[in-house]
Regions:
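Thiol-/selenol-based redox modules, centered on thioredoxin-like
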Residues: 166-200
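Short active-site neighborhood of thiol/selenol oxidoreductases, capturing the structured segment around
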Residues: 72-110
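Hydrophobic membrane-insertion alpha-helices, especially the h-region
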Residues: 5-25
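N-terminal "domain-start" segment that seeds a small globular fold
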Residues: 32-79
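Structural beta-sheet core signal
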Residues: 89, 120-122, 166
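Structural microenvironment flanking redox-active thiols in thiol-disulfide oxidoreductases
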Residues: 100-137
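Short acidic, S/G/P-rich loop/turn micro-motifs used as interaction or catalytic elements
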Residues: 93-99, 126-128, 180-182
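Short, internal strand/loop/helix patches
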Residues: 134-167
């Protein structure tokens, strides 16, 4: 085989390899684009779901329900509330572990922004022993109050997620928010908004 034929074969091999590589790269980019678009659609659905929940429960008024502190002292929800609004965080041992980790982690990060005496943490679980063990696992440097009975029954039961809301002595739900771990910037925006609205 002459030198020219060797060169021609080599060039054809290089072109074939380069063409295959470029096709694979284009296919990879197309797959990534489709994946990102899919993520974007999921995020939109999550945000719309959050907005619809906020609208559905806006101004919902809780009956005054009993709570218990870590020392076993019983009190009513209204005893923790004041005329000025407080941030209420409700969490359950039945919530998904990654949701708990994300939400509690974010709550810890805003303790230097929102006064601790303006935060009420309500913990729900099955039985006093489980409640105490679950509360201890959160490592929150805040007073925790256990639910006695089923105060939140029928309120975001199906969602089974931690949530926040603002409330006062009127016991009305305002600015309800369900953190979405897939969209952390949404949670950041919520806390920035309520900090500016209520605590600055």
């Amino acid at each position: 085989m002459s030198m020219y034929k060797w060169i021609l074969v080599a060039v054809l091999c290089i072109l074939t390899f380069a063409g295959g590589y470029m096709f694979a790269d284009v296919q990879k980019n197309a797959n990534l684009k489709a994946l990102y678009q899919g993520d974007s659609e999921i995020q939109k659905e999550l945000l719309l779901g959050n907005m619809s929940m906020t609208y559905a429960y806006s101004n919902y008024r809780f009956p005054d329900f009993p709570l218990m502190d870590r020392d076993g002292k019983e009190m009513f929800f209204s005893h923790l509330m004041e005329k000025e609004k407080k941030l209420v965080f409700r969490i359950s041992s039945n919530n998904c572990s990654s949701c708990i980790d994300f939400t509690v982690g974010y709550l810890k990060s805003i303790l230097n922004v929102i006064p601790r005496d303006k935060i009420v943490v309500i913990v729900e679980g099955n039985g006093k022993r489980e409640l105490k063990a679950f509360a201890d696992s959160l490592h929150l440097e805040l007073p925790l109050y256990y639910i006695v009975g089923y105060a939140f029954q029928g309120f975001l039961d199906k969602e089974n997620l931690p949530f926040f809301f603002m409330s006062s002595s009127e016991l009305k739900v305002e600015d309800l928010f369900i953190p979405i771990k897939e969209i952390p910037e949404h949670t950041e925006f919520y806390f920035r908004a309520i900090s500016k609205k209520y605590f600055l």
